[in-house]
Amino acid sequence: MKILNLFLVSLLLSSCGSGSNKQNPQELNYYDIKGFFEREIKELEKANPTVNKTTVYNQEEEIRTLKIEKWEQELALFSESDINKSSWKGSYKIDSLPNQLIYSAKEEDLRTRKIVIDFKDNKPSKFSIQNKNSNYLYTSIEDLTFYPDSLYIIHKKQKVVLLGGNDYKIVGKLKD
């Protein structure tokens, strides 16, 4: 019985090792959007800025000034637009311009359709992301824009067969 307990404890400890599920940055196929937003979320949580947040749902507008409690939730759509899955290697066309990087989906079934990253002084200054989900019952289009340390915009249009459409937009302006 002692041997079995020791075996189970050692098995448990070995499975909790220092290994990580994150991909090594040298193995990434595309820009590390998920890593960028993870770092940005930590910085925003630390800074705890006040946000002027405008929410528009089907043309009904609400404006509030608040502190965001869960930045991970607030910016989830940006993080979820990561295209660095090993199965997607080669699935995006890469265009590189001075101070701009553009990824365009080559396959129609990919959710993230296009990513444009603008750079200033070799640092990202703007992210523009277009996502689309579609099937025979549902279509969802997301246009996401993020300016580090100043502004984020989430614009989502949904259309559900027999139920109609919804349009919502969130604009968050960070204040010092």
PLM regions and their residue ranges:
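Extracytoplasmic electrostatic interaction patches
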Residues: I102-D176
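C-terminal motif of bacterial Sec signal peptides marking the signal peptidase cleavage site
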Residues: S14-S15
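Post-signal peptide N-terminal segment of mature Sec-exported envelope proteins
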Residues: P25-A47
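Sec-dependent signal peptide recognition
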Residues: K2-V9
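Surface-exposed acidic loop/strand-edge motifs in secreted or periplasmic proteins
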Residues: I41-I117
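Short, conserved catalytic or interaction motifs in soluble domains
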Residues: S18
